[in-house]
């Protein structure tokens, strides 16, 4: 199994990177530590919002707006981090671990939202590869999502993490460069994994051009140990 973790801050392009990788190898599967959190919040938002308002001494316009998921980032952060991670830091990790226990040995799996050191450690402990995705403004400064608290633990927990295997840095809106870099990282990971585990990728291409990955880029992940 190839396991890839994408981190770390919000709105950096992690989902774009994942989608470009899946474009190259359609068999790639996505996982997210926040999937179950979003499902729970969707089903229990009428209970959670008053609790969040009380915990933060906040009253006023409901946070859920028209969408029970994408309009409630503060509640997702609060319940996922301050509530459930306090009970068990690995609560969300264990759910993904159970899901990954059912994948086939030659599968390629991407976790799209690595935000905390224990989540990153889970990737590394399972022989995976960590990719930090960094979005920068036109002037080269780091982009921060204006709709989120930049100091929330889920945004800063990996600021000093030094165990990334790859870093993809790209300007806002430069999707051509982002795609090129994503495919280059995918190619490198497949090759590294092949050398490490003795598997043989089916196909070859020009290392200088990730779009020439041959059968790998064309959608075949027929590599075996």
What role is predicted for each listed range?
Residues 23-30:
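Post-Walker A helix-loop "phosphate-sensing" segment adjacent to the P-loop in P-loop NTPases
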Residues 35-107:
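ATP-dependent small-molecule kinase phosphotransfer cores
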Residues 113-116:
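Short, well-ordered beta-to-alpha junction loops that form the rim of enzyme active sites
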Residues 28, 107-108, 128, 165:
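Conserved acidic residues
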Residues 7-10, 95, 118-125, 132-209, ...:
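Small-molecule kinase domains that catalyze NTP-dependent phosphoryl transfer to phosphate-bearing small molecules
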Residues 1-4:
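Extreme N-terminal starter segment of soluble prokaryotic enzymes
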Residues 15:
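Walker A/P-loop
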């Amino acid at each position: 199994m190839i396991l890839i973790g994408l981190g770390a801050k919000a709105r950096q392009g992690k989902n774009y990177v994942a989608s470009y990788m899946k474009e190259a190898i359609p068999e790639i599967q996505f996982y997210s530590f926040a999937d179950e959190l979003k499902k729970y919040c969707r089903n229990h938002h009428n209970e959670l919002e008053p609790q969040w308002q009380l915990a933060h001494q906040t009253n006023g316009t409901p946070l859920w707006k028209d969408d029970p998921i994408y309009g409630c980032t503060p509640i997702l952060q609060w319940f996922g981090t301050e509530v459930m991670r306090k009970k068990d830091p690995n609560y969300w990790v264990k759910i993904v671990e159970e899901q990954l226990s059912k994948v086939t040995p030659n599968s390629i799996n991407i976790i799209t939202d690595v935000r905390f050191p224990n989540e990153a450690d889970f990737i590394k402990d399972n022989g995976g590869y960590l990719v930090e995705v960094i979005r920068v403004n036109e002037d080269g400064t780091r982009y921060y999502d204006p709709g989120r608290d930049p100091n929330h633990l889920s945004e800063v927990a990996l600021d000093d993490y030094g165990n990334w295997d790859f870093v993809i840095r790209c300007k806002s809106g430069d999707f051509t460069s982002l795609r090129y870099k994503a495919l280059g990282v995918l190619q490198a990971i497949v090759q590294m994994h092949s050398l490490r585990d003795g598997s043989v990728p089916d196909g070859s291409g020009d290392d200088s051009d990730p779009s020439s990955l041959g059968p790998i880029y064309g959608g075949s992940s027929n590599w075996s140990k």
